[in-house]
Protein backbone atom coordinates (compact mmCIF):
# COMPACT_ATOMS: atom_id res chain seq x y z
CA UNK A 1 0.00 0.00 0.00
CA UNK A 2 1.28 3.48 -0.80
CA UNK A 3 2.54 5.50 2.13
CA UNK A 4 1.05 8.80 1.03
CA UNK A 5 -2.54 9.78 1.74
CA UNK A 6 -3.23 11.77 -1.44
CA UNK A 7 -7.02 11.91 -1.53
CA UNK A 8 -7.25 8.91 0.80
CA UNK A 9 -8.41 9.23 4.38
CA UNK A 10 -7.53 6.95 7.27
CA UNK A 11 -10.82 5.34 8.33
CA UNK A 12 -12.37 6.21 11.66
CA UNK A 13 -12.75 3.64 14.42
CA UNK A 14 -16.49 3.64 13.67
CA UNK A 15 -15.85 2.64 10.04
CA UNK A 16 -13.47 -0.10 11.11
CA UNK A 17 -15.90 -1.44 13.71
CA UNK A 18 -18.75 -1.54 11.18
CA UNK A 19 -16.62 -3.42 8.67
CA UNK A 20 -16.72 -0.51 6.22
CA UNK A 21 -12.92 -0.53 6.24
CA UNK A 22 -10.48 -3.43 6.69
CA UNK A 23 -7.12 -3.38 8.44
CA UNK A 24 -4.50 -6.05 7.90
CA UNK A 25 -1.33 -6.51 9.98
CA UNK A 26 1.40 -8.87 8.77
CA UNK A 27 -1.10 -10.02 6.16
CA UNK A 28 -3.61 -10.97 8.88
CA UNK A 29 -7.09 -9.38 8.55
CA UNK A 30 -8.12 -7.71 11.81
CA UNK A 31 -11.70 -8.54 12.78
CA UNK A 32 -14.12 -5.59 12.82
CA UNK A 33 -15.10 -6.59 16.37
CA UNK A 34 -11.63 -5.52 17.48
CA UNK A 35 -12.62 -1.90 16.90
CA UNK A 36 -15.76 -1.82 19.06
CA UNK A 37 -14.33 1.20 20.87
CA UNK A 38 -11.12 3.17 21.14
CA UNK A 39 -10.95 2.41 24.86
CA UNK A 40 -11.01 -1.40 24.54
CA UNK A 41 -8.82 -1.52 21.44
CA UNK A 42 -5.58 -2.43 23.25
CA UNK A 43 -7.15 -5.46 24.94
CA UNK A 44 -8.67 -6.70 21.68
CA UNK A 45 -5.47 -6.11 19.70
CA UNK A 46 -3.60 -8.06 22.34
CA UNK A 47 -5.57 -11.17 21.37
CA UNK A 48 -4.21 -11.24 17.79
CA UNK A 49 -1.77 -14.02 16.91
CA UNK A 50 0.97 -11.73 15.59
CA UNK A 51 4.05 -10.09 17.10
CA UNK A 52 3.78 -7.19 19.54
CA UNK A 53 5.38 -4.66 17.19
CA UNK A 54 2.62 -5.22 14.62
CA UNK A 55 -0.10 -5.11 17.28
CA UNK A 56 1.27 -1.85 18.69
CA UNK A 57 1.44 -0.37 15.18
CA UNK A 58 -2.23 -1.16 14.57
CA UNK A 59 -3.25 0.10 18.01
CA UNK A 60 -1.37 3.39 17.87
CA UNK A 61 -2.46 4.05 14.27
CA UNK A 62 -6.12 4.14 15.32
CA UNK A 63 -5.38 6.03 18.52
CA UNK A 64 -3.39 8.67 16.63
CA UNK A 65 -6.09 9.14 13.97
CA UNK A 66 -8.79 9.31 16.67
CA UNK A 67 -6.86 11.86 18.82
CA UNK A 68 -7.13 9.48 21.76
CA UNK A 69 -4.88 10.17 24.76
CA UNK A 70 -4.16 7.00 26.80
CA UNK A 71 -2.05 9.01 29.26
CA UNK A 72 -4.89 11.19 30.50
CA UNK A 73 -7.26 10.84 33.47
CA UNK A 74 -9.78 8.01 33.28
CA UNK A 75 -8.15 6.50 30.19
CA UNK A 76 -4.90 6.01 32.11
CA UNK A 77 -6.67 4.48 35.12
CA UNK A 78 -8.79 2.08 33.06
CA UNK A 79 -5.78 0.99 31.03
CA UNK A 80 -3.89 -0.10 34.13
CA UNK A 81 -6.77 -2.28 35.29
CA UNK A 82 -5.66 -4.67 32.54
CA UNK A 83 -2.17 -3.56 31.62
CA UNK A 84 -1.32 -6.04 28.89
CA UNK A 85 1.95 -6.19 26.97
CA UNK A 86 0.87 -3.56 24.41
CA UNK A 87 0.08 -0.97 27.05
CA UNK A 88 3.33 -1.70 28.85
CA UNK A 89 5.26 -0.99 25.63
CA UNK A 90 3.46 2.34 25.24
CA UNK A 91 3.58 3.45 28.89
CA UNK A 92 7.27 2.58 29.28
CA UNK A 93 8.40 4.83 26.44
CA UNK A 94 10.18 8.10 27.21
CA UNK A 95 7.22 10.39 26.65
CA UNK A 96 9.21 13.62 26.79
CA UNK A 97 11.55 12.33 24.09
CA UNK A 98 8.55 11.27 21.99
CA UNK A 99 6.93 14.70 22.30
CA UNK A 100 10.18 16.32 21.10
CA UNK A 101 10.33 13.91 18.15
CA UNK A 102 6.72 14.69 17.22
CA UNK A 103 7.46 18.43 17.29
CA UNK A 104 10.49 17.99 15.01
CA UNK A 105 8.46 16.15 12.38
CA UNK A 106 5.48 18.50 12.69
CA UNK A 107 7.86 21.37 11.95
CA UNK A 108 9.13 19.43 8.92
CA UNK A 109 5.57 18.98 7.67
CA UNK A 110 5.46 15.17 7.52
CA UNK A 111 5.95 12.11 9.77
CA UNK A 112 8.96 9.75 9.63
CA UNK A 113 9.03 7.12 6.89
CA UNK A 114 7.61 3.66 7.58
CA UNK A 115 11.12 2.21 7.33
CA UNK A 116 12.30 4.30 10.31
CA UNK A 117 10.21 2.47 12.92
CA UNK A 118 11.91 3.97 15.98
CA UNK A 119 11.29 7.59 14.97
CA UNK A 120 7.82 6.82 13.60
CA UNK A 121 6.77 5.17 16.86
CA UNK A 122 8.21 8.04 18.91
CA UNK A 123 6.32 10.53 16.75
CA UNK A 124 3.09 8.56 17.23
CA UNK A 125 3.48 8.43 21.02
CA UNK A 126 4.18 12.16 21.03
CA UNK A 127 0.91 12.75 19.15
CA UNK A 128 -0.95 10.61 21.68
CA UNK A 129 0.46 12.68 24.54
CA UNK A 130 -0.29 15.96 22.75
CA UNK A 131 -3.88 15.38 21.69
CA UNK A 132 -4.30 18.75 19.97
CA UNK A 133 -1.07 18.61 17.94
CA UNK A 134 -1.11 17.97 14.22
CA UNK A 135 -3.89 18.42 11.69
CA UNK A 136 -5.94 15.48 10.41
CA UNK A 137 -3.72 15.02 7.35
CA UNK A 138 -0.52 14.70 9.42
CA UNK A 139 -2.18 12.27 11.84
CA UNK A 140 -3.69 10.14 9.08
CA UNK A 141 -0.34 10.00 7.30
CA UNK A 142 1.30 8.89 10.55
CA UNK A 143 -1.42 6.27 11.06
CA UNK A 144 -0.99 4.89 7.54
CA UNK A 145 2.78 4.65 7.89
CA UNK A 146 2.44 2.80 11.19
CA UNK A 147 0.28 0.15 9.52
CA UNK A 148 2.65 -0.05 6.54
CA UNK A 149 5.56 -0.50 8.97
CA UNK A 150 3.72 -3.55 10.34
CA UNK A 151 3.54 -5.10 6.88
CA UNK A 152 -0.13 -4.31 6.57
CA UNK A 153 -2.61 -1.89 5.07
CA UNK A 154 -6.02 -0.31 5.43
CA UNK A 155 -8.57 -0.73 2.67
CA UNK A 156 -11.79 1.25 2.68
CA UNK A 157 -15.07 -0.09 1.34
CA UNK A 158 -16.37 1.34 -1.94
CA UNK A 159 -19.17 2.95 0.07
CA UNK A 160 -18.43 6.23 1.82
CA UNK A 161 -18.80 4.78 5.28
CA UNK A 162 -19.48 7.91 7.26
CA UNK A 163 -22.14 9.20 4.92
CA UNK A 164 -23.75 6.20 3.30
CA UNK A 165 -23.09 7.76 -0.10
CA UNK A 166 -21.38 5.98 -2.98
CA UNK A 167 -18.25 6.48 -5.00
CA UNK A 168 -18.16 7.16 -8.69
CA UNK A 169 -19.28 4.14 -10.65
CA UNK A 170 -21.99 3.16 -8.16
CA UNK A 171 -24.71 5.38 -9.65
CA UNK A 172 -27.21 2.51 -9.77
CA UNK A 173 -27.24 2.34 -5.97
CA UNK A 174 -30.03 4.30 -4.30
CA UNK A 175 -28.62 7.28 -2.42
CA UNK A 176 -29.33 7.59 1.29
CA UNK A 177 -31.47 10.63 2.24
CA UNK A 178 -29.45 13.59 3.46
CA UNK A 179 -31.55 13.73 6.63
CA UNK A 180 -30.39 10.27 7.73
CA UNK A 181 -26.79 11.06 6.91
CA UNK A 182 -26.90 14.32 8.89
CA UNK A 183 -28.59 12.74 11.89
CA UNK A 184 -26.02 9.95 12.09
CA UNK A 185 -23.02 12.15 11.34
CA UNK A 186 -23.87 14.90 13.85
CA UNK A 187 -24.25 12.27 16.56
CA UNK A 188 -20.80 10.86 15.70
CA UNK A 189 -19.25 14.31 15.65
CA UNK A 190 -20.61 15.06 19.14
CA UNK A 191 -19.25 11.71 20.35
CA UNK A 192 -15.86 12.51 18.82
CA UNK A 193 -15.68 15.89 20.60
CA UNK A 194 -15.91 14.03 23.93
CA UNK A 195 -12.51 12.48 23.18
CA UNK A 196 -10.79 15.81 22.53
CA UNK A 197 -8.48 17.64 24.93
CA UNK A 198 -10.04 19.90 27.57
CA UNK A 199 -8.76 22.95 25.70
CA UNK A 200 -10.16 21.90 22.32
CA UNK A 201 -13.40 20.26 23.49
CA UNK A 202 -15.63 23.32 24.33
CA UNK A 203 -15.11 25.07 20.97
CA UNK A 204 -15.58 21.85 18.99
CA UNK A 205 -18.69 20.88 20.96
CA UNK A 206 -20.20 24.34 20.44
CA UNK A 207 -19.69 24.00 16.67
CA UNK A 208 -21.14 20.47 16.68
CA UNK A 209 -24.24 21.58 18.58
CA UNK A 210 -24.66 24.57 16.26
CA UNK A 211 -24.55 22.16 13.32
CA UNK A 212 -27.18 19.93 14.92
CA UNK A 213 -29.46 22.89 15.72
CA UNK A 214 -29.05 24.34 12.23
CA UNK A 215 -30.04 21.01 10.73
CA UNK A 216 -33.13 20.78 12.97
CA UNK A 217 -34.25 24.32 12.15
CA UNK A 218 -33.83 23.93 8.39
CA UNK A 219 -35.58 20.55 8.44
CA UNK A 220 -38.55 22.01 10.31
CA UNK A 221 -38.81 24.93 7.90
CA UNK A 222 -38.22 23.30 4.55
CA UNK A 223 -39.29 19.66 4.64
CA UNK A 224 -37.35 16.82 2.92
CA UNK A 225 -34.11 17.97 1.29
CA UNK A 226 -34.83 15.97 -1.87
CA UNK A 227 -38.01 18.02 -2.47
CA UNK A 228 -36.40 21.43 -2.07
CA UNK A 229 -35.71 23.90 -4.86
CA UNK A 230 -32.13 24.33 -6.04
CA UNK A 231 -31.82 27.65 -4.20
CA UNK A 232 -33.05 26.10 -0.94
CA UNK A 233 -30.65 23.18 -1.31
CA UNK A 234 -27.81 25.66 -1.79
CA UNK A 235 -28.89 27.46 1.39
CA UNK A 236 -28.76 24.21 3.35
CA UNK A 237 -25.34 23.26 1.98
CA UNK A 238 -23.94 26.73 2.73
CA UNK A 239 -25.27 26.65 6.30
CA UNK A 240 -23.86 23.19 7.02
CA UNK A 241 -20.49 24.01 5.44
CA UNK A 242 -20.19 27.13 7.61
CA UNK A 243 -21.00 25.17 10.78
CA UNK A 244 -18.41 22.53 9.90
CA UNK A 245 -15.51 24.95 9.32
CA UNK A 246 -14.36 24.98 12.99
CA UNK A 247 -14.33 21.17 13.24
CA UNK A 248 -12.61 20.09 10.02
CA UNK A 249 -9.79 18.63 12.15
CA UNK A 250 -12.23 15.97 13.41
CA UNK A 251 -12.40 12.77 11.38
CA UNK A 252 -16.19 12.82 11.29
CA UNK A 253 -16.28 16.58 10.70
CA UNK A 254 -14.08 16.29 7.61
CA UNK A 255 -16.04 13.28 6.35
CA UNK A 256 -19.36 15.11 6.64
CA UNK A 257 -17.90 18.25 5.07
CA UNK A 258 -16.74 16.26 2.03
CA UNK A 259 -20.20 14.73 1.76
CA UNK A 260 -21.93 18.12 2.00
CA UNK A 261 -19.64 19.51 -0.73
CA UNK A 262 -20.47 16.52 -2.90
CA UNK A 263 -24.19 17.11 -2.41
CA UNK A 264 -23.76 20.80 -3.19
CA UNK A 265 -21.99 20.06 -6.47
CA UNK A 266 -24.91 18.08 -7.90
Curated annotation (Swiss-Prot):
Main location class: virion
Composition bias of kind Acidic residues appears in 167-177
Is the keyword Nucleotide-binding in the record? Answer: no
Tell me the leader sequence span: none
Show the segment(s) annotated as Disordered.
158-177
| Function, in words | May play a role in virion budding and release by binding the ribonucleocapsid and the host membrane.
Protein name (database record): Probable matrix protein
The organism encoding this protein is: Quaranfil virus (isolate QrfV/Tick/Afghanistan/EG_T_377/1968) (QRFV)
Lineage of producing organism: Viruses, Riboviria, Orthornavirae, Negarnaviricota, Polyploviricotina
Amino acid sequence: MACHTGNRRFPSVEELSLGMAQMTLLGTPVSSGTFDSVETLADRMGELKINDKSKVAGLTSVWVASRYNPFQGGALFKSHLRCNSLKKIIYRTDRNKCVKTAKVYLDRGGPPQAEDWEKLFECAIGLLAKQDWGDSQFREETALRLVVAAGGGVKRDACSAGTGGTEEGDSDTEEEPLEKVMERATKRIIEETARLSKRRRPEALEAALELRDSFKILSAQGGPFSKLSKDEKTRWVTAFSKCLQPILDLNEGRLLYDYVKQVGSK
